[in-house]
Each structure stands twice: as C-alpha cells, then as structure tokens.
Amino acid sequence: AGASGLALSPDGKTLYVSDLGSRCVWAVPADARELTAGGKNCTAFLTGLPGYPGALAADEDGTLYISYRWARSSWLEKNADSTLLRGVALRAGQNLQEKLFGLPTQSPCAEAVSTADGSWTRALFARKAGGVTAVCPVESKVYFGTADAQRLPSANV
C-alpha cells in the first residue's frame, strides 16, 4: 500500500502522510531527509480510520481534510481471507469497481480534523454513490475530485 496522500501544515513544519496499508495518517517533520512510516521521528497522527485514507489537504487554519478510498472496508476485511482477493489482479470495469469500492449514498466521503489537537471537526457525506479521489480546500469551500464527476463538487466549510 504505502503513502497515498500528502499535506503540509500551514506553518510548513509538519508533513502529513496518509498510509493505505496501516489505515492511518502519519505526522513527520517536513525537514526530515529520509522517512519511513512508523520510523524515527514519525508519529501516528490519526489511527483507526473508518476507510482507507487517500488524498490529504490542509487549509490555512490547520484543518486536515482526508478523502477515503475503498470506504467499504468492512466488505474488504470480511472477504480478505477468501480466494477472491488472493487471485491474479485483473482489470475491472468502472461498474465493477464502483460496486466493490464505491461509497454508498450518505456515507462519509471525506472528513476534516484539527491538526492542533486531532479532534474531528466535520464529516462530509456522499450525495450519491461514488468515491472521492482528491480534496482541496480553497477559502471557505472544499472541492472534491471524483473519477466519475462531470463537475467538481464542493462543500462550504
């Protein structure tokens, strides 16, 4: 798995790294020359996330936005020991990918957390089935990049 998203704190001192394999977000010194998840100077900032963290974004107020990939993690975890997930990787069409990894309507598609104390400040919910692949805060809005959207959806924060 590995790093799937990066965000720099507003003061430029901390780099946040989302880790799909560990389902966590690491906080590391931005000036470190070499980093290993869980290694020297690497702190688990958020653990036990409800989905697999993807893109990260931090705004000027220090809020960290996290998008989730494969948020139907309960399905993946329940079936992790089956031969279905141990076979050869095959290309799957978009319809199959959405059924396996998409977010159901009204599921949290992204969340916001205060980088000052790690408290959750907001959850943003999917209006329709799908998934978020990127987030980007701009002033009082957060924009979400999705694979199937014609327009860039946003939410006021």
Write out the residue ranges for each language-model feature.
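Beta-rich, blade/repeat-based domains predominating
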Residues: 1-14, 47-61, 107-108, 127-139
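Structural signal for beta-propeller blades
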Residues: 23-25, 72-74, 110, 150-153
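Blade-edge beta-strand/turn elements of extracellular beta-propeller
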Residues: 1-2, 26-49, 117-127
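Conserved beta-strand positions in repeat-built beta-propeller and related beta-rich domains
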Residues: 8-9, 15-22, 66-70, 100-105, ...
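Blade-level signature of beta-propeller repeat domains, shared across WD40, Kelch, NHL, RCC1
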Residues: 132-157
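Loop/turn-rich, solvent-exposed surfaces of beta-rich toroidal or solenoidal domains
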Residues: 50-124
